[in-house]
């Protein structure tokens, strides 16, 4: 069985990353979003091991100290991390693992997993991004401006990624995202493992 591929997907807030990944997973049964470990409280409707692995702050810090996380960060006083063991066991089953992380997390992962493929999703423009953030109706004008500044910083790191997807049209962007996954699964190193018996049979019949 061919191993799964590790993917990093990053985007500025409001670029449509979560919606694109959700749409991808509805059609692609060989991919899964990483389930992070976190120290924050469980919210209504969430399940341990489904949405997150909920652990104590002490457990998290001990695991981080032991090097158990591919990447980890503190967000609004809570810790979030990606378990190396969970990622490895999922990849070993032939399932692709998607890490939805920012550029800083991506840099951490690349140091430990240089074979990871990374995809950056862009909005058509900062103006379009501002319109999307405003249309949500969730944030004040001040928060939106801060998010736009953060987005500009995030976008400046796009050259660090392997693939670039412009989300100016959702369906087109989704097709491009799916194309990346299809192309990676057709790489020689993957196909050699997947069709090992068939290839061996063809070559042995030639030599006999």
From Swiss-Prot:
The UniProt entry's GO CC annotations, sorted and at most eight, read: cytosol
- Does the record's keyword annotation contain ATP-binding? yes
Keywords assigned by UniProt? Answer: ATP-binding, Cytoplasm, Kinase, Nucleotide-binding, Transferase
Q: What Pfam families does the database record attribute to this sequence?
A: Guanylate_kin
Subcellular location field:
Cytoplasm
- Quick one: which residues bind ATP? 11-18
The record's listing under InterPro entries reads: GK/Ca_channel_bsu (IPR008145), Guanylate_kin-like_dom (IPR008144), Guanylate_kinase (IPR017665), Guanylate_kinase_CS (IPR020590), P-loop_NTPase (IPR027417)
Q: What is its EC number?
A: 2.7.4.8
**A GO term, aspect molecular function:** ATP binding
- Lineage, top-rank taxon, reads Bacteria
**Guanylate kinase-like domain residues:** 4-182
Which reaction does this enzyme catalyse, per its entry?
Answer: GMP + ATP = GDP + ADP
What does this gene product do? Essential for recycling GMP and indirectly, cGMP.
Family of the protein in this entry: Belongs to the guanylate kinase family.
Under which name does UniProt file this protein?
Guanylate kinase
